[in-house]
């Protein structure tokens, strides 16, 4: 089994010189591509392709396949993070008006429409839908609701019964066969104009959910679910088989064939570190440290500490795993710039202590490259340590044959210090990046099956001065292991202690969150839910609830409310800490309960009329606030004085889901703009009896039982 995909060093065709080119592939390339792209081995002249790779850098020239895969993975990661999880372009579906029925085929129940006065953009948009609702402007009747549907009821959230059969430039053909005979008769005699809409009258808005669904051709959390430490530690901490374990098992299986392939090819943090080392690290070498030192095994001790803490029910992997580190780092550094430039800087939430700590951690990970290139990946990353342990079961490996001339080029180019001084391999560190194979002048390096026979070079030549584990090494390993064990246990005790003290004032969590103790054991603090939230109502916590809640999402209703058409946070959560709810379930998921302050609410306190919260709740479709008359004065005869008192808000707790839109409106107008209040008079509070936190089951059914009581 051969796994060579590096570009071999240019070598002449003299007798005795072995060539490593795959003859058939090269011959096919020569026949299909211009000859000047290929090197001339007889004259030892580089082709244009090799010249371009050399210009890009020595690693590009040695292992172009690896660099291409790295680039593609980084670009994919950035697209998923900055485009797929970018909800601000979603808009409610606008109806398209001005359609005139041109041809009506009664037998086939089809009609062809002409867009005589319809807006061009709306015409193009309506042509992309599969079903439409038709409103006859003259009679103001809407057609398309399926049998039994009632406008405004849950059933109207579905598709229309009228199907778009064909769409052309300015024309539409509609299939009306699912309508009743009476409805077809009414439409057949209508002269128009008709209004077309993809949503029915009174249907629940879903533009944010639809936008994410359309963009998510690949799961937005893909790179998070293939980080094995994330899944393993979450499963251990929560004592549950999280669904992302299957993806982790898949990537570990692939890495049996390509040892540590995740680190060498796929990891976007590693590629970002490569870019930092190229742009900054190579210019500042005053801080360089030796390749050997106490730090070379930090990643194993860190992995042990993370797993010990997970066994104690505390999740630490979110703080140090590779993919959560980069997603959170980009979330707090680049994402605010994206939001500010696109939507205005007033739309960027303020920072707290959690933001500062995360940015410092991310910059520290990059800054370690000043000590040695890819210092984090080689010595610190616990996600990489998982793959190093898996290397014990590798099916392939790097081998060096007896033609090695000890030129040291492979040692110089290796990004992971995986080559010993005798040019053999440190198998726990090798990522099969194959850069060494591309610079070997004698083509002595092979990437083959572990059991494949190769005439290997003599080991310990030149001497490596590496010996079996002695007393000093044993003592160092014992100290490191003991420190990892103690650190994991003490971290768990400290974090659990802080959590119990902070349990009195629970934060409001996203809709669909599992019970709080399990939520803290499953949330990896990756920040994907913040990025997918269209109104930034979800914001990271600082240290107000202790270290265990650091960077976990909380609802900040003073800033914004939870959009009724969005379910993005659950869709992008990689571990199930937030359940992936369909919009029909999410609209009933209670994340808190609105509480009115009787002393500060303007009408309840008898100060002035105000209906902001009621209007906002009604517009959102929850109808959990209604008016009651308060403060009415009584004359001497016991009759109410006309014009006295106020219409005040009254909460229907069985309908409130804690979306926070009422609090946002009150804060924005009465606190921020008019400054008649110090804080919102209606706030969302979590806690027992105020929120629904379930691992499974229907929120819709639970809401039905609550309303029946």
PLM features: what roles do these ranges have?
Residues 2-144, 148-152, 157, 163-165, ...:
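Non-ligating segments of multi-cofactor redox enzymes
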């Amino acid at each position: 089994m051969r796994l060579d995909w590096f570009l071999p060093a240019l070598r002449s065709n003299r007798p005795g010189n072995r060539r490593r080119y795959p003859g058939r592939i090269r011959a096919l390339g020569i026949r299909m591509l211009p000859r000047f792209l290929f090197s001339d081995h007889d004259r030892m002249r580089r082709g244009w392709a090799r010249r371009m790779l050399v210009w890009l850098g020595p690693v590009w020239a040695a292992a172009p396949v690896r660099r291409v895969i790295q680039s593609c993975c980084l670009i994919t990661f950035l697209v998923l993070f900055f485009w797929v999880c970018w909800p601000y372009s979603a808009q409610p579906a606008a109806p398209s008006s001005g359609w005139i029925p041109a041809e009506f085929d009664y037998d086939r129940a089809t009609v062809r429409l002409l867009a005589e006065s319809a807006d061009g953009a709306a015409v193009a948009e309506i042509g992309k839908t599969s079903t439409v609702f038709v409103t006859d402007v003259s009679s103001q009747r809407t057609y398309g609701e399926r049998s039994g549907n009632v406008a405004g009821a849950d059933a109207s959230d579905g598709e229309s019964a009228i199907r778009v059969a064909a769409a052309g430039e300015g024309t539409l053909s509609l299939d009306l066969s699912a309508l009743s005979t009476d409805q077809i008769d009414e439409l057949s005699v209508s002269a128009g104009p008709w209004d077309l809409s993809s949503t029915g009258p009174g249907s629940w808005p879903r533009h944010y959910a639809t936008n994410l669904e359309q963009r998510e051709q690949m799961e937005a959390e893909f790179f998070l679910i293939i980080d094995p430490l994330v899944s393993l530690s979450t499963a251990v901490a929560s004592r549950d088989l999280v669904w992302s374990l299957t993806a982790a098992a898949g990537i570990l299986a692939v890495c049996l064939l390509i040892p540590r392939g995740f680190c060498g090819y796929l990891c976007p943090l590693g590629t970002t570190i490569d870019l930092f080392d190229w742009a900054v690290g190579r210019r500042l070498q005053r801080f360089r440290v030796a390749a050997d030192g106490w730090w070379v095994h930090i990643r194993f001790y860190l992995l042990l500490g993370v797993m010990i803490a997970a066994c104690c029910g505390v999740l630490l992997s979110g703080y140090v795993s590779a993919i959560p580190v980069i997603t959170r780092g980009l979330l707090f550094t680049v994402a605010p710039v994206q939001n500010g430039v696109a939507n205005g800087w007033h739309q960027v939430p303020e920072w707290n202590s959690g933001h500062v700590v995360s940015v410092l951690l991310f910059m520290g990970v990059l800054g370690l490259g000043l000590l040695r290139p890819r210092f984090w990946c080689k010595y610190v990353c616990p996600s990489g340590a998982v793959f190093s342990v898996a290397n014990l079961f590798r099916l392939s490996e790097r081998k060096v044959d007896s033609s090695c001339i000890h030129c040291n080029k492979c040692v110089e180019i290796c990004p992971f210090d995986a080559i010993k001084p005798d040019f053999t391999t440190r198998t726990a560190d090798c990522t099969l990046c194959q850069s060494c194979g591309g610079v070997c002048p004698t083509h002595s390096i092979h990437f083959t099956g572990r059991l494949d026979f190769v005439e290997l070079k003599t080991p310990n030549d030149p001497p490596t001065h590496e010996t079996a584990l002695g007393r000093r090494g044993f003592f160092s390993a014992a100290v490191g292991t003991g420190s990892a064990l103690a650190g994991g246990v003490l971290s768990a005790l400290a974090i659990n202690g802080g959590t119990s003290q902070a349990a009195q004032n629970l934060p409001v969590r996203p809709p669909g969150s599992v019970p709080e103790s399990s939520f803290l054991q499953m949330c990896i603090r990756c920040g994907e839910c913040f990025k997918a939230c269209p109104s930034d109502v979800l914001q990271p916590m600082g240290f107000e609830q202790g270290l265990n809640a650091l960077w976990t999402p909380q609802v900040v209703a003073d800033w914004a409310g939870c959009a009724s058409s969005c379910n993005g946070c659950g869709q992008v959560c990689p571990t199930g800490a937030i359940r992936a709810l369909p919009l029909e379930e999410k609209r009933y998921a209670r994340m808190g309960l609105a509480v009115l302050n009787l002393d500060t609410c303007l009408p309840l306190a008898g100060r002035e009329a105000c209906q902001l919260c009621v209007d906002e709740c009604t517009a959102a479709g929850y109808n959990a606030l209604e008016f009651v008359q308060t403060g009415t004065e009584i004359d001497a005869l016991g009759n109410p004085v006309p014009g006295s008192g106020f219409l005040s808000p009254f909460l229907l707790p069985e309908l409130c889901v804690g979306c926070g839109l009422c609090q946002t409106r009150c804060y924005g107008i009465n606190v921020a703009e008019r400054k008649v209040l110090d804080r919102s008079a209606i706030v969302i509070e979590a806690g027992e009896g105020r929120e629904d936190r379930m691992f499974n089951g229907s929120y819709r059914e639970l809401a039905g039982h609550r309303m029946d009581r």
